[in-house]
Amino acid sequence: MAVISLVNLHYQIEGQVILRNINLEFSKGETFVIMGPSGCGKSTLLRLIMGLIQPTAGWIEIDGTNTNLLSNKDWQLLRRKMGMVFQSAALFDSMNVYDNIAFGLRRGKMAESLIEKRVYEVLSIVGLEPSVAQKMPADLSGGMKKRTAIARAIAFEPPILLYDEPTTGLDPIIADTINDLICELQKRLNITSIVVTHDIISALKVADRIGLLYEANLVEVKERADLKNAEHPLMKAFLKNFELVV
């Protein structure tokens, strides 16, 4: 059974179609990259999966549950299965790194002694020193902010991670280390990762499969090893200047 299924998923706002009849399944332990030009609906798709907005038509199944049928309380429980890493990192500026990571754990009523253990555990997992816990977001580099956001997202040990443009705004060297971290987490935790990006370099680094969104439609899905057989002109354009080892 797929971990997440999108069934005839359609979303529009004020008459403008953002996503049109998307059918797609995500498997346990895979990293699926969603690519496409700006405004094609990539980030909207993540917001739909998280339940932050509701589909106009169609539905999403998570672990076999039709999310259209969930109450607000049930949605809150389901979201604990998903960690979200936003493009901006979305850290609380008034909290230090420790409290940013601990925030969700405290809302989940975890004992403070266990919270402390978990905070330092996830800091280690994402490659941050324990001393970073006392730093404020304003004192962090872009890469450190992103690692903190990832640490917060995995603190609850969710089986699903959603990344919205995780390397945007980072220099190429730092971006590459974040891509390495995404790969490491997928292997270490056997999680299902969905990564939205417009960067073909990042996509090729982390993806098991790549889906291309264009003008509200899912126009192509390819295994990483089968990209040499891409058919859609836009996918070919993304790949044109890269030598693929497949």
Model-derived segments and spans:
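Conserved ABC ATPase "signature" C-loop
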Residues: 215-216
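ABC ATPase C-loop
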Residues: 153-154
